[in-house]
Amino acid sequence: MKLDVIKLDGGKAGSVDLDDAIFGIDEIRGDILQRVVTWQLAKRRSGNHKIQVRNEVSRTSKKMYKQKGTGGARHGSRRAAQFVGGAKAHGPVVRSHAFDLPKKIRALALRHALSSKAKAGSLVVVDSVALTEAKTAALRATFDKIGLKNALVIAGPEVDANFKLAARNIPNVDVLPNAGLNVYDVLRRQTLVLTKDAVEAISARFAEKEAA
């Protein structure tokens, strides 16, 4: 697959060959994308919600009244869940929501996510994102010129410092180095912007996985 390369100012900068095995998958597997997005979001959950159980409630554990002779129901501690101020039965506890997902599934999902952007015409390749100065207003005007309203920008191994500073206050624009490329962030933004360095790094990344 061949795609035109543009400059940040909208000018043409040649073209780049994209690997069809990464960017040219025809049948997008939504089920695999859903599995990986769920896996990513589950890992992010803090899991620190907590409720007091019986041994943690600050109430006496003394028996409420004698077992027999009152005509009432038999009760023990006031910490029991049926009493106001008592414990919570089977409440949430601190735990991890993360679960395992095979690396091959995660890699396949990333291929499908990248291919979905290319198939939808939402993939843009720029020659470079290096800026001479960190000016948010200037970068916003540049994005407006090339039609970027909601985008994920993937740079090479390192993100240009001026570009990172200029872009961080622009809403609906995320900037990540190549190592940060992931399925969730690709799908949550309308347009995927890759630098030429990022394209090369992505191809090398999948080549290493296939060789392993």
From Swiss-Prot:
<comment type="similarity">
    <text>Belongs to the universal ribosomal protein uL4 family.</text>
</comment>
<comment type="function">
    <text>One of the primary rRNA binding proteins, this protein initially binds near the 5'-end of the 23S rRNA. It is important during the early stages of 50S assembly. It makes multiple contacts with different domains of the 23S rRNA in the assembled 50S subunit and ribosome.</text>
</comment>
<keyword id="KW-0689">Ribosomal protein</keyword>
<comment type="subunit">
    <text>Part of the 50S ribosomal subunit.</text>
</comment>
<protein>
    <recommendedName>
        <fullName>Large ribosomal subunit protein uL4</fullName>
    </recommendedName>
</protein>
<keyword id="KW-0694">RNA-binding</keyword>
<dbReference type="GO" id="GO:0005840">
    <property type="term" value="C:ribosome"/>
</dbReference>
<comment type="function">
    <text>Forms part of the polypeptide exit tunnel.</text>
</comment>
<dbReference type="InterPro" id="IPR013005">
    <property type="entry name" value="Ribosomal_uL4-like"/>
</dbReference>
<dbReference type="GO" id="GO:1990904">
    <property type="term" value="C:ribonucleoprotein complex"/>
</dbReference>
<dbReference type="GO" id="GO:0003735">
    <property type="term" value="F:structural constituent of ribosome"/>
</dbReference>
<dbReference type="GO" id="GO:0006412">
    <property type="term" value="P:translation"/>
</dbReference>
<dbReference type="Pfam" id="PF00573">
    <property type="entry name" value="Ribosomal_L4"/>
</dbReference>
<dbReference type="GO" id="GO:0019843">
    <property type="term" value="F:rRNA binding"/>
</dbReference>
<dbReference type="InterPro" id="IPR023574">
    <property type="entry name" value="Ribosomal_uL4_dom_sf"/>
</dbReference>
<keyword id="KW-0687">Ribonucleoprotein</keyword>
<dbReference type="InterPro" id="IPR002136">
    <property type="entry name" value="Ribosomal_uL4"/>
</dbReference>
<keyword id="KW-0699">rRNA-binding</keyword>
